[in-house]
Design a protein with these regions (language model features):
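Non-transmembrane "mature" sequence context
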Residues: 2-169
């Protein structure tokens, strides 16, 4: 483990070890996929985990939320539920054009799982269907319905990583 990786919070280290090396990909490819999911390098100019962490801490642009929501066919109610942002606060964030660090962290979690699903399943369309459909590995719940908490996101990630490694069920 590199010194830079060791200095990161545990969740980022786990994400780096598991997600960035799915199918043998180097870390920079995983970051590029996640940046694309969050709206692209113009919105999220990060090339490293550290840069991405700093952007999340500063608050991601509201346009990143729009990119994730449209990219994964999320309606307003799903965004409010998954990100735990009241509708009035969401409207204020849209006017301010920036999310809080806490909201950004939840959006990062959603984007990370979405990017992982796209990577594992091979396309955004397949990831979209999978995220919205009931899943036996999640007790019949749709993966998106689990992403409002870290524990739920970890369960969804475990299911995706099992799929990536050919373990079904």
């Amino acid at each position: 483990m590199t010194a830079a990786l060791a200095a990161l919070p545990a969740a980022y280290a786990i994400w780096h070890n598991e997600y960035c090396h799915v199918a043998g990909r180097p870390a920079v490819s995983g970051i590029a996929d996640l940046v694309r999911t969050l709206g692209g390098p113009r919105l999220v100019p990060a090339r490293t985990v550290e840069e991405l962490r700093d952007l999340v801490r500063a608050g991601l642009p509201y346009a990143s939320l729009s990119a994730v929501a449209s990219g994964f066919s999320l309606d307003g109610a799903e965004v409010v539920s998954i990100l735990r942002i009241p509708a009035r606060t969401l409207a204020r964030r849209k006017r301010e054009r920036r999310l809080s660090p806490e909201e950004s962290d939840r959006l990062f979690r959603l984007g990370r799982i979405g990017a992982l699903a796209e990577d594992v399943l091979g396309s955004r369309e397949k990831a979209n269907r999978w995220l919205h459909a009931a899943n036996r590995g999640l007790g019949g719940a749709a993966p998106l319905s689990q992403l409002d908490t870290d524990l739920g996101a970890e369960r969804v990630e475990e299911v995706l990583l099992r799929l990536a490694h050919g373990v079904v069920g």
